[in-house]
């Protein structure tokens, strides 16, 4: 399985780690960027007459938030380049071609923060930005539109807005000579400067609102006969409940996360252990099992599983951020 396929699967299949307040004190809160309510947009001047606006539709991002010490917060983001859209099919195809983004050769754009510091109007996030195979240091100013608050579904949600300008030529995004020609003084076919607009909404979900019949049935079986017996039946392929005979990764996540939120960490760990044994190539399950161990204070096991996740999916922002947190402890 390619890294790109795993990346897309993880974006759409993996809600954020939910038991952010369970376990050891001193660990940051783990937020995942909610792509459905965020925007990674750009704008470039066209012919000196108008702006072409676009955005990327597929991306993942992890924020490790330290509310009492924001400067210790960190973030990693990975964007799928082929997900760009400018509301023109022919233009999008051209932008994806080797003339510009060359998405087959450079399938992702990435940002990894190095330091966060407060500024007059908000925060500045310094870090390494990789685009078109070129990595440069960027300082991105952000304003926090709202600190973590509960939304209508009980999810913890915080929102940031940021803007910056980069040079496309600094990253080797050149196009043909025509697109770099100057028709009149100061009027380029496509400007060198690209304005980037970021609206980031990040969440910690309320697992009580997760609806999954198989996951809820799994909890009922665990309550009825214990986690060991239930997991043994699943591994043997023989259960007493047809609703859990053949369940997917998300059902395991629902069951384990609800058990963890209820303080039943040992039962949650048992669910994840079986799930990973049965579905060893699920990045979502590995991420959640590792996070549970991190919250329980089992640093060595968490590190090992996050390393395994990084080997499975090099684009995993969850693995990147948790490894950073655990390695500095």
What is the predicted function of each stretch?
Residues 254, 288, 321-322:
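Canonical tetratricopeptide repeat
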Residues 21-217:
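Low-complexity, acidic/polar, glycine-enriched regions of mature
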Residues 249, 283-284, 317:
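Helix-start (N-cap) detector for alpha-helical repeat units in TPR-like alpha-solenoids
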């Amino acid at each position: 399985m390619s890294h790109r396929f795993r990346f897309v699967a993880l974006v759409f299949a993996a809600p954020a780690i939910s038991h952010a307040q369970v376990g050891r004190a001193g660990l940051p809160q783990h937020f995942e960027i909610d792509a459905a309510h965020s925007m990674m947009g750009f704008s470039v001047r066209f012919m000196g007459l108008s702006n072409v606006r676009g955005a990327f539709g597929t991306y993942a991002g992890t924020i490790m938030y330290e509310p009492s010490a924001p400067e210790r917060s960190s973030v990693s983001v990975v964007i799928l380049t082929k997900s760009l859209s400018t509301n023109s099919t022919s233009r999008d195809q051209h932008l994806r071609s080797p003339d510009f983004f060359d998405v087959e050769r450079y399938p992702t754009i990435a940002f990894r923060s190095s330091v966060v510091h407060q500024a007059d109007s908000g925060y500045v996030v310094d870090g390494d930005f990789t685009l078109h195979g070129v990595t440069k240091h960027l300082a991105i100013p952000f304003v926090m539109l709202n600190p973590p608050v509960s939304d209508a579904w009980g999810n913890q949600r915080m929102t940031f807005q940021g803007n910056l300008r980069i040079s496309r030529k600094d990253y080797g995004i050149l196009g043909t000579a025509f697109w770099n020609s100057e028709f009149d003084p100061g009027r380029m076919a496509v400007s060198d400067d690209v304005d980037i607009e970021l609206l980031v909404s990040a969440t910690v979900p309320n697992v009580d609102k997760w609806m999954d019949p198989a996951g809820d049935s799994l909890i009922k079986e665990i309550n009825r006969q214990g986690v060991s017996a239930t997991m043994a039946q699943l591994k043997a392929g023989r259960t007493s409940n047809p609703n859990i005979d053949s369940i997917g990764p998300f059902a395991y996540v629902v069951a384990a996360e609800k058990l963890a939120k209820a303080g039943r960490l040992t039962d949650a760990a048992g669910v994840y252990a079986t799930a990973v044994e049965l579905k060893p190539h699920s990045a979502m399950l590995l991420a959640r099992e590792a996070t549970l161990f991190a919250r329980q204070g089992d640093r060595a096991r968490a590190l090992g599983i996050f390393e395994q996740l990084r080997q499975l999916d090099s684009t995993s922002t969850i693995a990147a951020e948790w490894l950073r947190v655990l390695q500095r402890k």
